[in-house]
């Protein structure tokens, strides 16, 4: 499951956001002795849905990751000395998040996005894995992975050449993902290929006057973002019984500058 949280850095202008998936978990309540609810059944409530906000600057599309047999070195979990392990194939990328500007727009504060994963350290990305055994018992392990982000930028001056990189690494598959996002930008009719260029780090924030001369007229820009995982490794240390299936949750946090 992927949930998206949108935040603004302090001092930044308000930024509208688009939340493609929302899930709220209400944990069981602790009822103090003597309270009128004491003894009553209190369970877990799950709320999910899609929230739409008008006039948004960016739209985000989370995607669930499911490791199937062709994606893994070995189908399922393999038992070893250290427990049960499953690893993705070398060079296999899983794209978990895509984003693009809703339409052609202009550079301004509050437009440039940055994505982090909640409770995931960039230096050593790992999350908890919840595994189910054959008879329904639950045991926990961990999932480690390599995390990559790519932010692409393009304007009407470079529209015929292709898009430029603001941050991240471009691979052939990442280029396809960026192209897929750019084609969803309203009004986009430029070349969606990688131009081999690097844009300035604040390309979405800088005003048009710093990039264009007066005779060139106004500036129109488009942007795309992709987040991917690779080197995925699922590990259940010391698992005596085979783990039949497992699940991990990621929460991307989108911050606008």
Swiss-Prot record:
Keywords: Fimbrium, Plasmid, Signal. It comes from the Bacteria. Its main location: other. It is found in: Fimbrium. Residues 1-26 form the signal peptide. GO terms for cellular component: pilus. This is K88 minor fimbrial subunit FaeJ.
